C-alpha cells in the first residue's frame, strides 16, 4: 500500500490533528517545521496544524483538538510533550479515549520513548510512512499518585519512567543549566560536573512485591519503557513495571555504573537491584521526582506508583 492510498483509505474523520512542539531557537524551529511539512505534503497527508508556545500550552491545545473531534492526533515533540498530551487524554472519559489514536514524530531534547519504537528524528519520511499505515497497538501507562506540600492530590501518568533521587537531580540540573547556557550538550556536561559536589544518597522507604526496604538509596527508576537505559528490559505492553533500585556504590563503581548504563548493561552492576511489579510505594522527603523527564512537585508522605494496562491507542511502526 503506497502512502497516498493509505491516506485516502482513512476517510474524512481520519484527518490528523498535528500538535507541533518546537525546540528552543526560532530559526532552527522554522527549518525543522519546513522539512516536516514538505514530507507530509509530498505524501498527501491531510492535517490541521497547531503549535505550542510553551510547555504549559500543550495540554490546552490537546484539549482543543479533542473537543474538535480529531481521532488521530500526532505529537511532534519529545518525552515531556508526549507526557503532557497523554495526561490530557487520560482526563477524558473512557469512551472518548478509546476512539483516539495517538502518534509521535520525535522533536525533543530527549526522545527516549520514540527511540524505543525505532522512530528517528533524522528520518521524518520513515516516521510519516509508518504513521500513514495506521498500525495501532494498545499500550500501558504508569501512574504516580502523590500529595504535594500544599495538600493537593495528583495523579500523573507516564509512558517512559519515573525517576527518584540522583537521576531526577541530574535532569533538574540539566534543565536549569540549559536555560543559562542555551546548549543541551553543555548543559548535560555541566550537570554531570555539578553532581560531583552533590549528595548521592537519599533515605527511602520502599515497598516492592511485599519486600519492605528502608535505607539509603542513590536512585530509583520505575520504567514502563526503557527509562533512559535504567530499565532496559521493560516493554510498554506487558502489564508490568520494571524497577531498578540503585544503592550508593563506591566512587570507582559509580564510574563503572555510568559505563554500563551507556553500553546497555546497567542491570549487570552489583549495586543495581531489579524488580518487576504491578505497583509499589515509596516515601522520601528529600529526593526529587522526575516524570518522563519533567520535575514533579515535591511529594509529601508516601506515594504510590502503579500500572494501567492497555489504556492508550498508539501508532507504531510497521
Q: Residues of each region from the PLM?
A:
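ATP/NTP phosphate-donor binding region
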Residues: 1-76, 87
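Short beta->alpha linker loops
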Residues: 53-56, 77-80, 108, 165
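Short glycine/serine/threonine-rich phosphate/pyrophosphate-binding segments
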Residues: 58, 81-85, 112, 139
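Glycine-rich phosphate/pyrophosphate-binding beta-alpha loops
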Residues: 163, 167, 221-232
Amino acid at each position: 500500500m503506497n502512502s497516498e492510498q493509505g491516506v485516502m483509505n482513512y476517510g474524512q474523520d481520519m484527518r490528523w490533528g498535528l500538535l507541533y512542539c518546537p525546540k528552543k531557537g526560532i530559526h532552527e524551529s522554522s527549518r525543522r517545521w519546513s522539512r516536516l511539512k514538505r514530507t507530509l505534503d509530498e505524501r498527501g497527508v491531510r492535517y490541521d496544524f497547531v503549535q505550542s508556545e510553551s510547555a504549559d500550552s500543550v495540554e490546552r491545545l490537546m484539549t482543543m483538538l479533542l473537543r474538535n473531534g480529531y481521532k488521530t492526533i500526532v505529537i511532534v515533540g519529545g518525552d515531556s510533550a508526549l507526557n503532557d498530551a497523554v495526561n490530557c487524554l487520560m482526563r477524558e472519559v473512557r469512551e472518548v479515549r478509546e476512539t483516539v489514536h495517538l502518534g509521535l514524530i520525535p522533536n525533543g531534547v530527549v526522545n527516549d520513548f520514540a527511540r524505543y519504537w525505532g522512530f528517528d528524528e533524522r528520518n521524518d519520511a520513515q516516521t510519516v510512512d509508518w504513521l500513514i499505515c495506521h498500525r495501532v497497538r494498545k499500550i500501558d501507562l504508569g501512574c504516580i499518585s502523590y500529595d504535594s506540600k500544599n495538600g493537593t492530590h495528583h495523579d500523573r501518568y507516564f509512558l517512559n519512567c519515573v525517576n527518584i533521587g540522583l537521576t531526577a537531580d541530574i535532569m533538574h540540573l540539566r534543565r536549569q543549566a540549559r536555560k543559562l547556557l542555551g546548549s543541551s550538550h553543555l548543559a548535560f556536561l555541566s550537570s554531570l560536573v555539578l553532581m560531583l559536589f552533590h549528595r548521592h544518597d537519599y533515605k527511602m522507604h520502599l515497598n516492592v512485591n511485599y519486600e519492605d526496604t528502608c535505607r539509603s538509596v542513590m536512585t530509583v527508576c520505575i520504567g514502563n519503557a526503557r527509562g533512559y537505559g535504567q530499565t532496559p528490559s521493560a516493554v510498554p505492553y506487558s502489564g508490568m513495571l520494571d524497577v531498578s533500585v540503585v544503592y550508593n556504590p563506591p566512587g570507582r563503581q559509580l564510574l563503572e555504573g555510568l559505563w554500563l548504563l551507556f553500553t546497555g548493561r546497567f542491570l549487570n552492576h552489583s549495586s543495581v537491584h531489579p524488580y518487576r511489579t504491578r505497583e509499589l510505594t515509596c516515601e522520601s522527603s528529600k529526593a526529587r521526582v522526575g516524570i518522563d523527564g519533567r520535575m514533579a512537585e515535591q511529594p509529601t508522605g508516601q506515594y504510590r506508583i502503579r500500572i494501567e494496562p492497555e489504556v492508550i491507542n498508539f501508532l507504531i511502526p510497521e
